[in-house]
Amino acid sequence: MFDLPDIAVVSVFHTKIILFHFFVVSSQTECVMFERMSLTTPLDKYIADHSSPEGDYLYRLFRATHVEILAPQMASGHIQGRLLKFLVSMIKPKRILEIGTFTGYSALCMAEGLGEEGLIYTFEVEDELEDFTRRWIDGSDYASKVKFIIGDALEIVPTMGERFDMVFIDGNKREYVKYYEMALEYLDEGGWILADNTLWDGHVIEEERQDAQTSGVRAFNDLVRNDDRVEVVILPLRVGLT
């Protein structure tokens, strides 16, 4: 059983930033605002059956992640992966920065949507994931479009001399504010920022939850909500986005 994560999308138009929170809520934690639904319910099966398929390679990667890797629920999965591909196909970025590769599922989904000149730089700080993730990225049809880097994006990106059209934040929740600030610095005008897990299993509304990760996500949400360049729209993705 696995759950779809939360996702936020930021779009930069001139000096204006528009932020959308696309979210689904995990069944792992009670939340008074939303009914929890895992991808084992009839409705979830209907959603999957009526969405574009992920393809055999991504399916095998997702299965291998669940068999071989600790905390496999961190992988994006079918529906979020199709959304990422859809957004990339629509936005048409030339350079994508991903912070938090995990096993490469999301990077490969985004790579599917890239044009001929598109390239993804994806960073992962957990070096124990390197062999598994590099094997799956290098074995894919999109290996030439994905630059997989082990290391801290906060330290390496400023040394790269690159600009990005799109940034996907899915790394250490404690560092989300730093990732956001860095993303804005290296994002071209008209670029997009996506941030995953912005509801953090519903913990963001639980006042008793004061752990570093929950606090990091809250700080990010508060920052973008109060940034005068940002408009915030919360959309219940699981209720129906085709």
Task: Please tell me what each predicted stretch does.
Residues D3, A8, I17-I18, F22-M166, ...:
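A short alpha-helical cap/connector motif
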